[in-house]
């Protein structure tokens, strides 16, 4: 924020601050700014998610699920963090230097240590996994066999629900020592906190599925969509219906969010294995595991790599190419589909389609964030700043995702201007609505380059 804007805030704050202090004792922040009960619950969940340590080692849910990085972490983002960030607690807390994390694999490949089969034999009974994002969960959690959370679909204890997920996360990642004793090493979330955390997580990202095919304009992305939807060629839509996390109606494997053994564990020369660090095989769902892993949504994929449960593949093109690999085609899932055989240009086309729908989702989120900003006056300034910072990050993602595939340079230019305008809005107190409205217009211009206006 500029020095002049800082001066203006102080100058105009005196009277409102007095009124604010008179009433704050009887109104929580959530109640004051979010009179709707569900909105207040979501806001409380947000504050817990990013600030509550549960009397543990200093980590919060937001330590690994970063709002500014698509609710996940990756090596490039990790490299920007200071050495005293709670993510690196195993490096500076002597009680957690053994059997809690592997700092080398975390920093180099974005992997965290999970004891999904229990906390006996900590030295051997573990796996190294990437951090999944927590976006669009209303569309991805439910299955015929119950809720699916985490990479293998069994990430939550007790009833396996999203609400219960935080219980397991606190015990796994927040503990002060490997003993994991409630009261001494951490406290579990209360029922009210679990309700709020669930509400917040369910509010993140898409609330409904796409309806494919979309009226895309880009030649390569349009071809990629056709391959994606073709049940004889790409076969993608059978398990990622509408590019989501659920099986297509009539899928012989079942309905809803399904688990599959796709052979990712059988990939040769996985990056983390090349280090010589201990990497026990990951047996997936259950204890002992059955080798299956959960189906993720693909709308959010292009800007949330690396890919698969072990971060084995860096790029979206590489992730699509995996389904041509013997590891997939000889797996139970690949055998059940009769194999997939795409040529190099078809792989690029499917990846282009995934890049475009990801950028379109970023634009949708940005417009939503911008339209929700600039309406709270002085007391909502900080909340506006959070929204605008998020919009800036999402705009950067959209630009990078498109540019990374050489797609829609005109849209990239519009997004660059939208980002500049959003930054101006974030540094302006009284004229911000002007910049916000112009940024929204630029996002719509970018979207119009990629997809027909009637959509």
Set out the residue ranges of the language-model regions:
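Sec-dependent N-terminal signal peptides
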Residues: 11-20
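Periplasmic c-type cytochrome electron-transfer domains
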Residues: 29-455
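N-terminal signal peptide c-region/cleavage motif recognized by signal peptidases
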Residues: 23-25
């Amino acid at each position: 924020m500029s020095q002049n804007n800082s001066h203006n805030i102080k100058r105009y704050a005196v009277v409102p601050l007095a009124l604010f202090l008179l009433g704050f004792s009887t109104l929580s922040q959530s109640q004051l700014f979010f009179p709707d009960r569900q909105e207040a619950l979501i806001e409380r969940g947000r504050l817990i998610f990013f600030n509550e340590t549960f009397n543990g080692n200093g980590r919060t849910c937001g330590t690994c699920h970063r709002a500014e990085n698509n609710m996940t972490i990756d090596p490039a983002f990790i490299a920007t963090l200071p050495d005293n960030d709670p993510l690196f607690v195993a490096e500076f807390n002597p009680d957690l230097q053994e059997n809690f994390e592997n700092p080398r694999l975390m920093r180099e490949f974005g992997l965290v240590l999970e004891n999904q089969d229990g906390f006996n034999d900590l030295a051997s009974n573990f796996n190294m996994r990437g951090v999944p994002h927590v976006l669009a969960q209303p569309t991805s959690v439910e299955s015929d066999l119950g809720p699916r959370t985490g990479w293998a679909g069994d990430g939550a204890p007790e009833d396996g629900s999203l609400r219960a997920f935080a219980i397991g996360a606190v015990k796994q990642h927040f503990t002060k020592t490997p003993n994991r004793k409630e009261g001494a090493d951490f406290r579990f979330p209360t029922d009210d906190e679990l309700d709020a955390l669930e509400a917040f997580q369910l509010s993140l990202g898409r609330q409904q599925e796409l309806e494919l095919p979309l009226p895309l304009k880009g030649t390569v992305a349009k071809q990629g969509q056709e391959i994606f939807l073709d049940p004889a060629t790409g076969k993608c839509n059978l398990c990622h219906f509408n590019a989501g996390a659920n099986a297509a109606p009539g899928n012989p494997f079942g309905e809803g969010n399904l688990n599959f053994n796709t052979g990712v564990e059988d990939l040769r020369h996985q990056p983390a294995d090349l280090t010589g660090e201990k990497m026990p095989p990951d047996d997936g769902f259950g204890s002992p595991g059955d080798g299956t892993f959960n189906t993720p949504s693909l709308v959010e994929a292009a800007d949330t790599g690396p890919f698969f449960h072990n971060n084995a593949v860096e790029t979206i093109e590489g992730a699509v190419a995996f389904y041509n690999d013997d590891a997939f085609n000889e797996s139970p899932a690949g055998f059940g589909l009769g194999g997939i055989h795409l040529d190099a240009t078809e792989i690029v086309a499917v990846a282009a389609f995934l890049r475009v729908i990801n950028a379109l989702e970023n634009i949708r989120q940005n417009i939503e964030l911008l339209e929700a900003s600039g309406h709270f006056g002085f007391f909502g300034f900080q909340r506006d700043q959070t929204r605008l910072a998020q919009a800036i990050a999402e705009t950067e993602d959209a630009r990078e995702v498109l540019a990374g595939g050489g797609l829609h340079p005109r849209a990239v230019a519009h997004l660059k201007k939208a980002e500049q305008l959003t930054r101006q809005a974030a540094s302006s107190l009284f004229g911000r609505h002007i910049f916000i409205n112009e940024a929204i217009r630029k996002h719509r211009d970018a979207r119009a380059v990629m997809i027909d206006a009637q959509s």
